[in-house]
C-alpha cells in the first residue's frame, strides 16, 4: 500500500454520524466527563472518541452500548436526542 493516499472513511461526516457525535458530546459534558475519561470508561482511545464526537466513525452497536454505559444513558435516548 506504499504510495497510496489515505482514503477517508466512507461514512465520515454523514449527517447522522455528526448528529450522534454531537449528542454524545452533549451527554458527556452534561455528566462532567472529559473526552479522555469517557474514552477510558468506554474502552476506546481518546483520539477515537474525538472522531466519534466529530462524526468521523461509523459506530458498531456494541460501541454505542459501551459509550452509553459510560455515560449512564440509554442508547435509545441518545439516538432520539440525535434525531435518529
Short names for language-model regions:
Residues 77-84:
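Short amphipathic recognition helices of helix-turn-helix/homeodomain-type DNA-binding modules
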Residues 21, 47-50, 83:
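Glycine-centered small-residue hotspots that permit tight backbone geometry or close packing
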Amino acid at each position: 500500500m506504499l504510495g497510496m493516499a489515505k482514503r477517508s472513511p466512507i461514512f465520515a461526516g454523514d449527517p447522522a454520524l455528526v448528529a450522534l457525535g454531537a449528542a454524545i458530546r452533549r451527554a458527556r459534558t452534561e455528566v462532567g466527563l472529559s473526552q479522555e475519561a469517557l474514552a477510558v470508561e468506554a474502552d476506546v482511545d481518546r483520539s477515537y472518541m474525538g472522531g466519534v464526537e466529530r462524526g468521523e466513525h461509523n459506530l458498531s452497536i456494541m460501541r454505542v452500548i459501551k459509550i452509553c454505559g459510560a455515560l449512564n444513558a440509554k442508547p435509545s435516548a441518545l439516538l432520539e436526542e440525535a434525531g435518529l
